[in-house]
Amino acid sequence: MTRYLLSKLGQAIVTIVLVVLVVFTLLRFMPTAGYFSKEQYKTMTDAEKTAYLRNMGVLDPMPVQLQKFVSGLFHGDLGRSITLYPNMPISNVLGEKIQYSLLLNFISWFTAAIIGMPLGVAMAKNKSGLVDGLGTLYVVLIRSIPSIIIHFFIQVFLSKWFNLPMLFYMDQPISWLLPIVSMSIGSIAGYATWLRRYIVDEENKDYIKFATVKGLPKAFIMWRHIFRNAIVPIAINIPSDFLLMLSGSLVIESLYAIPGTGGLLIKSITAMDNPLVQVLVLLYGALSVLGVFLRDIVVSFVDPRIKLVASNN
């Protein structure tokens, strides 16, 4: 098991190093206008712009720039935003915005899990019954209607029917309700659909039929064998789902005026804020790699096949 995890850790480290190199190199081909505020770019002469870039180290040889960049990462210095949040440390920009995205997305993810998974189990246990029919209807409606229409319906009509705030306010927890509903409603359908499918697939396997013939209690078979194996494909995606919360939700955060990280990368690219673009691309790349690594760790604990291979090796 240790050998397996160390192998995955090594792969993750190599991938992150490659991400740093690729992001650093590509950003050096972006227009240098992204290192100036609008006022600076308009008023500075060419000589002043060159001196400014040289002072920032942008004109240094690539190896020197890379060494300074990596050193800054290790010391927590992510640089400063230039055009989008003039002269504001990027760490402060991310610190202010991530808290909103992380809080709302975590609550939404937890809500979706505690509702969607029991719904999926109930649908599988009552296959072709009332619960399964209603659950399937819910899933079909959620999947067939464009998400933006669902979010708009939730914001406009639920706020009116239940007298809830239409916009998000951090100091008013009641205003969190509609964004959480909007964020979780699709995930509930996803958890229910996939867990139902995996449970039904497990029920049709030979080892379950054999356990039934042996006379084992249905509840024991369901929770000891069927559910345990059916939850594996869902459990392995939980770490990556959790890390994706840090990237926020562009549509929902815009709809409810949530000052989170959703759309921050697009805004920074539009504003040609090179240092902020560099950090965000690196952050999202590192989160993706970390999500895959954490998924491998979860798999090693919940999937008995990984344990068997590890023990045999």
Residue spans of the language-model regions?
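Cytoplasmic-entry segments and transmembrane alpha-helices of multi-pass inner-membrane transporters
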Residues: 2-7, 11, 119-154
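An internal, D/E-rich "acidic patch" concept
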Residues: 58-115
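Generic hydrophobic transmembrane alpha-helix motif, especially the helices
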Residues: 134-189, 266, 274
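Transmembrane alpha-helix signature in integral membrane proteins
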Residues: 9-17, 21, 91-122, 227-228, ...
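Hydrophobic alpha-helical transmembrane segments of membrane transport/permease proteins
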Residues: 16-67, 163-172
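Glycine-rich helix-loop "coupling/hinge" segments at transmembrane-helix boundaries
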Residues: 39-41, 244-287, 291, 307, ...
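Hydrophobic alpha-helical transmembrane segments of polytopic membrane proteins
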Residues: 19, 110-112, 116, 179-187, ...
